[in-house]
Amino acid sequence: MAKGGREKIKLESTAGTGHFYTTDKNKKLHPEKMELMKFDPKARKHVAYKEVKLK
């Protein structure tokens, strides 16, 4: 069987609350860092989430 090309990543809040989401992405097709606007329940507003390495 073929090996999967998707890797798990962590999207961490830039608001400094420590909240994060986990997801996966295809790093061969999209090698750049992901940045999304998502809801931070600790800050109670939409903030930017940046991709960081999942430990």
UniProtKB/Swiss-Prot annotation:
GO cellular component, one term: cytosolic large ribosomal subunit
Keywords: Ribonucleoprotein, Ribosomal protein
Ranges of compositional bias, category Basic and acidic residues: 1-11
Keyword Endoplasmic reticulum: no
Name of a matching Pfam family: Ribosomal_L33
GO biological process terms, semicolon-separated: translation
GO molecular function term, any single one: structural constituent of ribosome
Keyword Ligase: no
Region (Disordered): 1-26
Family: Belongs to the bacterial ribosomal protein bL33 family.
PANTHER family in the record: 54S RIBOSOMAL PROTEIN L39, MITOCHONDRIAL, LARGE RIBOSOMAL SUBUNIT PROTEIN BL33M
NCBIfam families: PRK00595.1, rpmG_bact
Protein name, as recorded: Large ribosomal subunit protein bL33
